[in-house]
A protein has these predicted regions:
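Surface beta-strand/loop "capping" patches
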Residues: 165-209
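Beta-strand signatures of extracellular beta-sandwich domains
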Residues: 215-219
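Short beta-strand/loop motifs in extracellular/secreted proteins, especially
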Residues: 17, 46, 77, 110, ...
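Solvent-exposed serine/threonine-rich low-complexity stretches and specific carbohydrate-binding patches
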Residues: 229-236
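Conserved glycine-bearing catalytic or ligand-binding loops at nucleotide- and phosphate-handling centers
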Residues: 139-178
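Glycine-rich beta-solenoid repeat tracts in large extracellular/virion proteins
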Residues: 6-13, 26, 30-45, 50-55, ...
Length: 236
């Protein structure tokens, strides 16, 4: 911690490395920021975190981004089970100054979370929760993560401070092919099934730019209603 450059830098041609069990950007207590310029920089295929909570990383308090996955050589990297922007008590008090995670410059097919135990908690960061930028950064999976209190959108496919708006037919290219978000058409609780909530939604997308079947995830929103704080379930 406290480096003027990157806390952990995995350079090109350094493969098979798993970064786990670290406090990156905080003091040893995990309660006080002692930020690096960037927390973690991956420039080759590697993984940050694990499904074992005992070896989770705390990546918080860094001046810029918490984790950066950069370049085509870093494609297929994974980020699992980390606390990014939280303190050691799990409170959102030590956000990184930029994005929680930035995927950029052609990094593709990366996996950010997935299923129980592999999800990341990403909160209180000065940018988006996960930002994907660069027109050739595609097919990155962002799944099951808890995001709240970030300054930018939970998932940002433009690298800009605003959400990527939906467009008709979704034929465009860009980060993750600028995938449209689902549109909620209705939600109702049937009188005869009061414990159930029936939801109707639509996703306007180009079959050439998406993998079918689409997996749609549902979350309980954070306090300002713009990010998914608690994963509820999936439909496909």
């Amino acid at each position: 911690a406290g480096n003027t450059g990157v806390g952990v830098h995995v350079a090109t041609e350094s493969g098979g490395i798993q970064i786990r069990g670290n406090s990156i950007g905080t003091d040893v207590t995990g309660l006080v920021a002692l930020g690096n310029l960037q927390g973690v920089l991956l420039e080759h295929k590697n993984s940050v975190g694990t499904s074992d909570p005992a070896f989770a990383n705390l990546i918080s308090g860094n001046i810029e981004n918490g984790i950066v996955i950069r370049g085509a050589a870093a494609s297929e990297s994974g980020v699992y089970g980390n606390d990014i922007g939280l303190d050691a008590l799990g409170l959102p008090t030590l956000g990184n100054g930029g994005a929680g995670i930035s995927i950029e410059q052609g990094a593709s097919k990366c996996q950010i979370g997935w299923d129980s135990g592999l999800d990341n908690r990403i909160a209180d960061n000065g940018g988006g929760g996960v930002v994907v930028s660069g027109s050739d950064s595609i097919e990155n999976l962002i799944s099951h993560n808890s995001m709240e209190g970030n300054t930018g959108p939970g998932i940002n496919l433009l690298g800009a401070p605003l959400d990527d708006p939906n467009d008709a037919g979704d034929p465009d290219e860009g980060p993750n092919r600028l995938q449209n978000t689902p549109v909620l058409l209705s939600a109702e609780r049937p009188i005869d099934l009061p414990s159930e909530l029936h939801v109707v939604y639509a996703v306007d997308t180009d079959p050439l730019n998406a993998h079918y079947p689409l997996v749609i995830e549902f979350f309980r929103a954070d306090a300002d209603g713009t990010e998914g704080a608690v994963y509820l379930g999936s439909d496909w």
